[in-house]
Amino acid sequence: TSACCDKCFCTKSNPPICQCRDVGETCHSACKFCICALSYPAQCHCLDQNTFCYDKCDSDS
């Protein structure tokens, strides 16, 4: 999936430390550290930390 995030949280530090908390069957394409729960369907989230948030995935929000 394309690199996007609907639930991104950042610290108030400078620079900020941001992490996407979206959960889905896969992680986005730019994720380097993806963790998936052993469930069906899989529940995965990306543990990468960045200094920014990706654009939202859901264009309706």
UniProtKB/Swiss-Prot annotation:
<dbReference type="GO" id="GO:0005576">
    <property type="term" value="C:extracellular region"/>
</dbReference>
<feature type="disulfide bond">
    <location>
        <begin position="31"/>
        <end position="46"/>
    </location>
</feature>
<dbReference type="InterPro" id="IPR035995">
    <property type="entry name" value="Bowman-Birk_prot_inh"/>
</dbReference>
<comment type="function">
    <text>Strong inhibitor of trypsin with a 1:1 stoichiometry. Weaker inhibitor of chymotrypsin.</text>
</comment>
<feature type="site" description="Reactive bond for chymotrypsin">
    <location>
        <begin position="38"/>
        <end position="39"/>
    </location>
</feature>
<feature type="disulfide bond">
    <location>
        <begin position="36"/>
        <end position="44"/>
    </location>
</feature>
<feature type="disulfide bond">
    <location>
        <begin position="8"/>
        <end position="53"/>
    </location>
</feature>
<feature type="disulfide bond">
    <location>
        <begin position="10"/>
        <end position="18"/>
    </location>
</feature>
<feature type="site" description="Reactive bond for trypsin">
    <location>
        <begin position="12"/>
        <end position="13"/>
    </location>
</feature>
<feature type="disulfide bond">
    <location>
        <begin position="27"/>
        <end position="34"/>
    </location>
</feature>
<dbReference type="GO" id="GO:0004867">
    <property type="term" value="F:serine-type endopeptidase inhibitor activity"/>
</dbReference>
<keyword id="KW-0722">Serine protease inhibitor</keyword>
<dbReference type="Pfam" id="PF00228">
    <property type="entry name" value="Bowman-Birk_leg"/>
</dbReference>
<keyword id="KW-1015">Disulfide bond</keyword>
<keyword id="KW-0646">Protease inhibitor</keyword>
<comment type="similarity">
    <text>Belongs to the Bowman-Birk serine protease inhibitor family.</text>
</comment>
<feature type="disulfide bond">
    <location>
        <begin position="5"/>
        <end position="20"/>
    </location>
</feature>
<feature type="disulfide bond">
    <location>
        <begin position="4"/>
        <end position="57"/>
    </location>
</feature>
<dbReference type="InterPro" id="IPR000877">
    <property type="entry name" value="Prot_inh_BBI"/>
</dbReference>
<protein>
    <recommendedName>
        <fullName>Bowman-Birk type proteinase inhibitor</fullName>
    </recommendedName>
</protein>
